[in-house]
From Swiss-Prot:
The gene is clpX. This is ATP-dependent Clp protease ATP-binding subunit ClpX. Keywords: ATP-binding, Chaperone, Metal-binding, Nucleotide-binding, Zinc. Residues 3-56 form the ClpX-type ZB domain. The keyword Mitochondrion does not apply. ATP binds at residues 122-129. GO terms for cellular component: HslUV protease complex.
Length: 423
């Protein structure tokens, strides 16, 4: 019986679970010879919610069938403009990877090996966006790691196992989910070997990191401190098997096309050899001819290249592609700014000439699609600053002179047009 006699003969009631008295809690609910307080009820609800959220969700693929390569490609088309061959390669590789995971339990003589992916393409060509879209489509845990921040274990910097720690954090430390997630390692080209010859000095952020990543990529038991703490000898670690994690590595690989051209020019000598000069060939066209030996020459170790068998190259985005990126994807920049202005009950019109000017500016800056937002933000800054305090504005028009810095947005009032910043 959850009751006790007090000194003043008052019969006190106590929670049968936590032992708190009726005076220490807001509410005490009675059952057959037991009591439960409001705090314990809240705790029970929280436990049930957490268990329900994770029940049966080993991966995001358990609720529905794995989409076909064509379906994966169609969804990528909604978010990523251009890069058709890269999207096809990724769709097939990801489909095969998760098809393999769904049949892991079946005993067979043939063991399917994992196909990790290497994306090669200039800055702002869509490498990260492709990986993000794939993870969102498949509803699996996803993390982006920057290879330039990684160092060998024991040196100042991030240990490669920190990548798995972040993946665990992104799925609330559910190990089964993390073991079927996607890891995107950016700037992989920046940890290339500094030279072909081994150096006396330790290359802690180059070949050493490649060796450390190799173990992670091919499959190992990574030891991760619980809840993001730092490693020390007297603590228990969470063990995560990386064998079934899909690793996608990406990099710009500046200078790789020269390595490829040097190789192809050496082999292309004599009658019947291609006479197309390297000046006539687009960088993207050259990169499509990449071979493992070119990547080794660039500075990646052969063992790591062997663990990244699927190679997809992305081309530089031209003016037309950048203009499409501004307006066509589901989350296109222009659509986002339309929504922002609609919240102020104002219509935003960005004219085709302005879109062309934005694309030209991004090409000049060599930032690709990544630089589009900063250009548009800069052009709209003044009007977004002034608009909330203005009365009667119904429309804002952006033309190419605004993007080029030679003019200001045109504001259409309910009675007459004005230029932003004018009184």
């Amino acid at each position: 019986m959850a009751d006790k006699k007090g000194s003043n003969s008052e019969k006190l009631l106590y929670c049968s679970f936590c032992g708190k008295s009726q005076h220490e809690v807001k509410k005490l609910i009675a059952g057959p010879s037991v009591f439960i307080c409001d705090e314990c009820i809240d705790l029970c609800n929280e436990i049930i919610r957490d268990e329900a959220a994770g029940a049966g969700l080993e991966t995001g693929l358990s609720k529905s069938d794995l989409p076909s390569p064509q379906e994966i490609r169609d969804i990528l088309d909604q978010y990523v403009i251009g890069q058709e061959r890269a999207k096809k390669i990724l769709a097939v590789a990801v489909y095969n990877h998760y098809k393999r995971l769904k049949h892991l339990d079946k005993k067979d003589d043939v063991e399917l090996s994992k196909s990790n992916i290497l994306l090669i393409g200039p800055t702002g060509s869509g490498k990260t966006l492709l990986a993000q879209t794939l993870a969102r489509l498949l509803n699996v845990p996803f993390v982006i790691a920057d290879a330039t921040t990684l160092t060998e274990a024991g040196y100042v910097g991030e240990d490669v196992e920190n990548i798995i720690q972040k993946l665990l954090q992104n799925c609330n430390y559910e190990v089964d989910k993390a073991q079927r997630g996607i890891v995107y390692i950016d700037e992989i080209d920046k940890i290339s070997r500094k030279s072909d010859n081994p150096s006396i000095t330790r290359d802690v952020s180059g070949e050493g990191v490649q060796q450390a990543l190799l173990k992670l990529v091919e499959g190992t038991m990574a030891s991760v401190p619980p809840q993001g703490g730092r490693k020390h000898p007297n603590q228990d670690f969470i063990q995560v098997d990386t064998t079934n994690i899909l690793f996608i590595c990406g990099g710009a690989f500046d200078g790789l096309e020269k390595v490829i051209v040097d190789r192809t020019e050496k082999t292309g000598i004599g009658f019947g050899a291609s006479v197309k000069s390297k000046q006539d060939r687009d960088a993207g066209e050259v990169l499509r001819e990449v071979e493992p030996e070119d990547l080794i020459k660039f500075g990646l170790i052969p063992e790591l290249i062997g663990r990244l068998p699927v190679v997809a190259t992305l081309g530089k985005l031209d003016e037309t592609a950048l203009m499409k990126i501004l307006v066509e994807p589901k989350n296109a920049l222009v659509k986002q700014y339309h929504k922002l202005f609609n919240m102020e009950r104002v219509e935003l019109e960005i004219r085709p000439a302005a879109l062309q000017a934005i694309a030209r500016k991004a090409i000049r800056r060599k930032t690709g699609a990544r630089g589009l937002r900063s250009i548009l933000e800069q052009a709209l800054l003044d009007v977004m600053y002034e608009l909330p305090a203005m009365k009667g504005v119904s429309k804002v028009i952006i033309d190419d002179n605004v993007i080029d810095g030679d003019g200001k947005p045109l504001l259409i009032y309910e009675d007459a047009p004005k230029v932003a910043g004018s009184n």
